[in-house]
Regions:
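Short alpha-helical transmembrane segments in multi-pass integral membrane proteins
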Residues: 6, 10-40, 95-159, 208-255, ...
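Transmembrane helix-bundle signature of multi-pass secondary active exporters and lipid flippases
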Residues: 40-93, 159-163, 254-317, 342-345, ...
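Small-residue-rich hydrophobic transmembrane alpha-helices
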Residues: 67-125, 166-175, 289-347, 386-396, ...
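Alpha-helical transmembrane segments of multi-pass membrane transporters
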Residues: 129, 181-206, 220-229, 345, ...
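Alpha-helical transmembrane segments of multi-pass membrane transporters/permeases
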Residues: 172-198, 209, 213-216, 307, ...
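Bergerat-fold GHKL ATPase/HATPase_c domain
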Residues: 456-511
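Conserved ATP-binding N-box helix of the HATPase_c
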Residues: 504-529
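Glycine-rich/acidic phosphate-handling loop/turn and adjacent ATP-lid/helix
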Residues: 543-570
Length: 603
């Protein structure tokens, strides 16, 4: 694939300022987006496949009342997933941005904090175990399903440490080039859970509590599979947390995790209020229908959730490197992939609505089928909310992500539900279709309000294009992994230096040095088909990032004793470089060089 031409844009306003064109290819971004989308889809199933399968088996084996009991227990599921979900999502975002900014030690600190906090948070959740009966009585209005809710909540809370550690290990394993291990952990957890679901509920007759107990043991099995990564000496991220780094590592982790914490906490709070209102004013059928709607979101996350994982990991790294072109192409590709999936889900379930409702033990009468189909039309907007919330976090617009999630999970959800309850009680609306219209209105108005606020606050829409808000100048281009194309580097650097006022003699030395580095990569790695190069002016230094999708190879450490003519050395680059670093992250070779321009001039 030949590189495409794009106009070079300046650092403000998105207007052309340099007056020339450069070539940037999306080949690496496209291949890595597809790779991590596939891996992320499997790993995301750790959180969402288990509840979906549980609910389906509960409906088939135990009936609609058991589904309602499990639905009321969803608030406890959110508590169980809170530490692991927040840290397995926010942690990779933080380390990706830190690695992009060349802060390796802080990335280790964020990894260490993520693991410790997931474990500690899970153990603290056990403090709620004695109160399961009390909360279940409130949620179920002391009805016939009170005991089922209590038992389900007990085993769910008991699983919290296992869920947290399993999610964190899987999330960081993906970033650390261990995708197969992460997928193996997920397959083990889900496989054990599904088998034990049938054993506990059908043969041991544990009721709805059997589903929660099976999930606990499934996550424990997933941790056993991931233990080799935990004890591996080849991990990129180390258990290192220096005293002087604690505050900054915590700040980076908290910033990246704030929206995920808001998501989970707001779901817990609103879930309690919503389930109470539905139980008191709509009845068991309303709770069951809302639980099925929650499973629609889970099904969507299972099939398309790899996009969210990719935005967190690959997107965070690209933003840290200020590769806005790559970030935009990644999001565009993910949107195309996932909305095709959304369309298939909506069309398929619209046709087979009755069969789907039957699988959850619900009677598919006319009102219920109509309500379910109305809910299906909320899925495109629901997915947009998910994409926006994750993208805002990766580009450090956490306040927008928090705003969106607060509107979606608390403000609009509770406000519109109160209006819905009023319409049912005062205007005598049919309760089931009214619940469906409530779900649709919440998902539709949330992105509208958020995007309007973003436009007013930032004067642009992030998903449509980011602008560099710093004073630093950045230029990226791509070349294919062939020796004859290395000459393109000279032209790109010469134009870059001319447009930024860098003297010609400096540009010549820099061009020759980078040609040496790229030839070294191509000469010792037969699997390189594309190389991305980024030039960044930062505080008087030139930062050069060289990214390739070949096999693991460190061009800074390799010594070829048989290279008598020194065709593949980097001697000039060694003299010019002030600092240099190599990282193998997300299955890409990343070489970062810091060159003092004064040093280049003296050479």
């Amino acid at each position: 694939m030949h590189p495409e031409k794009y106009s070079v844009r300046g650092v403000k306003g998105g207007k052309e300022k340099m007056g020339y064109e450069y070539r940037r290819n999306e080949a690496i971004i496209r291949s890595k987006t597809r790779e991590f989308f596939g891996v992320g889809t499997v790993v995301t199933a750790t959180s969402y496949l288990v509840p979906v399968v549980d609910f389906m088996l509960i409906g088939i084996l135990l009936g609609a009342d058991a589904v309602a009991a499990a639905g009321l227990g969803d608030s406890f599921v959110d508590i169980a997933e809170l530490p692991g979900f927040v840290l397995s999502a926010g942690g990779p975002v933080a380390v990706g941005i830190l690695l992009g900014r060349r802060k390796r030690r802080l990335a280790d600190g964020a990894f260490t904090l993520s693991f410790l906090l997931a474990l500690i948070g899970g153990l603290l959740a056990w403090c709620l175990l004695p109160f399961c009966g009390y909360f279940s009585g409130i949620l179920s209005n002391n009805g016939a399903i009170t005991d089922d809710v209590a038992r389900y909540a007990f085993f769910t809370l008991l699983s919290t440490p296992f869920v947290g550690v399993n999610l964190v290990l899987s999330g960081f394993a993906i970033v650390d080039n261990r995708s197969k291990l992460a997928m193996g952990s997920v397959i083990a957890a889900n496989g054990v859970n599904i088998i034990l679901d049938v054993v506990f509920m059908k043969f041991l007759r544990m009721g709805v509590a059997g589903a929660a107990a099976a999930s606990l043991l499934g996550n424990a099995a997933g941790i056993l599979v991931a233990l080799p990564y935990l004890f591996s000496k080849k991990r990129t991220f180390r258990f290192v947390l220096r005293r002087e780094d604690i505050r900054e590592a915590w700040r980076e982790l908290a910033s990246s995790s704030s929206s995920f914490a808001t998501d989970k906490i707001s779901r817990i709070i609103s879930g309690l209020i919503v389930n109470l209102l539905l139980m008191y004013f709509v009845g068991n059928m309303g709770v069951a229908l809302y639980a099925v709607y929650g499973q629609l979101r889970s099904i969507l996350r299972i099939l398309a959730g790899g996009a969210l994982q990719t935005i967190s990991t690959l997107g965070g790294m690209l933003y840290g490197e200020r590769d806005f072109y790559g970030l935009q192409r990644m999001f565009s590709l993910l949107a195309k992939y996932t909305y095709a999936i959304v369309a298939v889900i909506v069309a398929g379930l619209f046709v087979f609505s009755a069969a789907f409702l039957n699988s959850y033990g619900m009677t598919p009468d006319a009102d219920t089928v109509m309500a379910f189909r109305i809910m299906l039309f909320s899925l495109p907007f629901l997915w947009l909310n998910d994409l926006l919330a994750r993208f805002y976090t990766s580009v450090q617009r956490q306040r927008l992500s928090v705003l969106l999630l607060t509107l979606q999970n608390v403000v609009f959800k509770i406000l519109f539900l109160l209006l819905c309850v009023a319409a049912i009680s005062q205007l005598h609306w049919s309760s089931i279709p009214a619940v469906a219209c409530w779900c649709l209105s919440v998902e539709l108005l949330t992105p509208v309000a958020t995007l309007l606020w973003e436009k007013r606050t930032y004067h642009n829409i992030a998903i449509l294009g980011l602008e560099d808000q710093t004073e630093r100048t950045c230029h990226t281009f791509s070349i294919t992994g062939e020796r004859e194309n290395v000459a393109d580097i000279h032209r790109e650097i010469e134009q870059f230096c001319r447009q930024n006022g860098i003297p010609h003699n400096k540009g010549v030395f820099l061009a020759i040095a980078l040609e040496e580095a790229v030839l070294n990569i191509i000469g010792h790695n037969d699997h390189v088909d594309m190389i991305d190069i980024c030039l960044l002016l930062e505080e008087g230094d030139l930062i050069v990032r060289i990214r390739d999708n070949g096999a693991p190879f460190d061009p800074l450490a390799f010594v070829d004793d048989g290279d008598i003519l020194q065709e593949n050395n980097i001697s000039l680059l060694e003299r010019l470089t002030d600092q240099k670093a190599y990282t193998r992250i997300m299955n890409m070779n990343n070489t970062v060089l810091s060159i003092k321009l004064e040093g280049a001039q003296n050479e």
